[in-house]
Regions:
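Compositionally biased, low-complexity segments enriched in small residues
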Residues: 7, 20, 67, 73-76
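Short, compact, well-ordered microdomains
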Residues: 53, 69-70, 77-82
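Short aromatic-glycine-(Arg/Gly/Cys) micro-motifs in beta-strand/loop hairpins
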Residues: 33-62
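A short, exposed loop/beta-hairpin motif centered on an aromatic-Gly-Thr core
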Residues: 29, 56-74
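Short intrinsically disordered terminal tails
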Residues: 1-4, 80-84
């Protein structure tokens, strides 16, 4: 999957769950629970290969990645506390 498709996937999952997201250029960032979720890939262009969806905590000084999930659904499940 490419990063642009990953953004569309994240937006669709947010729409299903009534969660918010913001478009920043071609990228998108979702807010779920206490996390911000965004697709991460290499290279960092719309046609770059997706590595996963990162979950980060706001207001951290080092902005380290808290967790990297394979799909937008799993990332949002983790962020909102939904268990399988």
């Amino acid at each position: 999957m490419i990063l642009e498709e990953a953004c569309h996937s994240l937006k669709l999952e947010c729409a299903f769950r009534d969660l918010g997201f913001v478009d920043i250029g071609w990228k998108c960032v979702a807010h779920a629970g206490i996390f911000f979720i965004q697709p991460v890939g290499f290279p960092d262009y719309p046609d770059g290969e997706l590595l996963g969806f990162s979950l980060t905590l706001p207001n951290t000084h080092d902005m380290r990645r808290v967790r990297l999930m394979r799909t937008a659904k799993r990332a949002l499940d983790y962020a909102t506390g939904v268990d399988d």
